[in-house]
Amino acid sequence: MKIEYFGHSAFKIVSEEGLIMLIDPFISNNPLCSTPVETIDADVILITHGHSDHFGDALEIANNSGATIIATAEIANFVQRQGINAIAMNIGGTVSINNLVNVTMTDARHTSSIDFTEEVEEGGSATGFVITLESGKKIYHAGDTGLFGDMKTVIGDIYKPDIALIPIGDKYTMGIEDAAIAAKWLQSRIVIPMHYNTFPGIEQDVELFAKNVEDEIIGTMTVPLMPGEDYREE
């Protein structure tokens, strides 16, 4: 299993059996990312919400690779109107990908307009995802969100993610203090911070976040990734 970071909230996850999943593929306009968008392959693209720094290059990558996009009904409808395959789902629902990997959509506290079109369109709710791999290992991508109680009572207590990808940038999402609380509630083995240091206004000291988490939470390790780096497990 491999989790590759492109910067901001963009990740590529390769499952144990080789399924390639992109999440929020903000690539070509991402100042932290040097990967050419035309080199990126995917089987599935997950979009947490409609903002341009998360929807990113989803249409181009899907068109090039034949990937299917998974998102809320509103975003999936928009994608289908562009001639791209999409699966619509909503919060609390689960879809199976090739009978290998399950994707569950979770709540997030944010907005979700499709803001890069000539006229802004409704994007439905902002969301996160819990991805259950072939081995049963679970990865939580929180999307853009503030701290909310279901991180503990639903995502932490019920889904129990092994690895959590959580925003720390503040201003548009939770900052490092609330993100450390989220990490405590989730009780994941591994926490990978995201959505920081991309633009002015979301600059954060990731090492301070890591120290806060590891000082407060026994059994949780923070793994800050630079764009282009990856985290792997057998």
Curated annotation (Swiss-Prot):
Keywords: Hydrolase. SMART domains: Lactamase_B. SUPFAM superfamilies: Metallo-hydrolase/oxidoreductase. Coiled coil: none annotated. It comes from the Archaea. One of its GO terms (molecular function) is hydrolase activity. Pfam families: Lactamase_B_2. Belongs to the UPF0173 family. PANTHER family: UPF0173 METAL-DEPENDENT HYDROLASE MJ1163 (PTHR43546:SF3), UPF0173 METAL-DEPENDENT HYDROLASE MJ1163-RELATED (PTHR43546). This is UPF0173 metal-dependent hydrolase Msp_0516. It comes from Methanosphaera stadtmanae (strain ATCC 43021 / DSM 3091 / JCM 11832 / MCB-3).
